[in-house]
Each structure stands twice: as C-alpha cells, then as structure tokens.
Amino acid sequence: MVTVTQLQPGDVAHVDRYLPLNRLDQQRAEGSTYLVAWDDEQPIAHAHIAWVGTHLGVPEIQDVFVVPERRRRGIAAQLTDAAEQEARARGWDSISLSVSQDGNVAARQLYAKLGYADAGVDPVRVSGSIMLRGRPFEVDDSLLYLVKPL
C-alpha cells in the first residue's frame, strides 16, 4: 500500500538515495513542503509544494516525480491530492502547477482529469543553467500554467 507523508529531516538521507530532491534547499528555508510517496519503507515518488514566490501567487505543485517502474498506477494523482489537501488545510482556495507546453502529454492528461485548467497566462519560457542542490542543471522548456479551485 502506498502512503504519502511530508518529508521529515530524518528521512532526507534515505529518500535522497532513491529520488532526486532537487528543491530540498527551499524546504529547509520553510518556503515549501516535500511530499514523499512510500511503498512500505521504500520511497517511490515525490512532489514539491512551493508556498511563496510562485508565478500565480497561489501554492504551486512542482517537481512531481514517480520512479519509472511505478508510473501509471495512480501515484502522481495521490501526490497531487495530498498537495491539494495540504493547501486547503493552510486556508488556500486554489492551487497551481506547470507542465511542459510541448511535452509530457501523459502529465497534461492526468492534470486535466484531476480538474486543472489553463490559468489564462502566457506560457513561461525557461532556459539556461540553474543551480539545483549545488549542481548546474540545464533547462530549455516552455511551461504552461494550470490552476484548480479547491
């Protein structure tokens, strides 16, 4: 059975061996929350919720990642639901996320099924080198922002 919990400081080393915790520094600064999906003691997926500094000014689900062998089993939907519940618990009435405008058709289909709609803003082009956990990472993509009322 898969369960979703907030990433706790004591779990970081264990989870980091299996999943790319790209935005861990933001959680440490208390501007975000990592959710981790577990199958028994094994971390199999995560999602990041940014609470401040987001493009639409509402919480933003970012960096949803499910290990390849566990995809298409509802785990991303479970993580998204947990993020929505956390946003509701904090008093928010909507939540957002972004997805590649030209790629990741499966993710766009999932988010539409879960009730996310185009936020009505122009896609945002991201390109260049950014630092993630002390390492450079090259990005080149256009992001489509989606939003869902809670």
Model-derived features: where do they sit?
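Terminal substrate-recognition subdomain of acyl/acetyltransferases
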Residues: 124-150
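A short, internal acetyl-CoA/4′-phosphopantetheine-binding micro-motif in the GNAT/acyltransferase core
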Residues: 64-71, 99-101
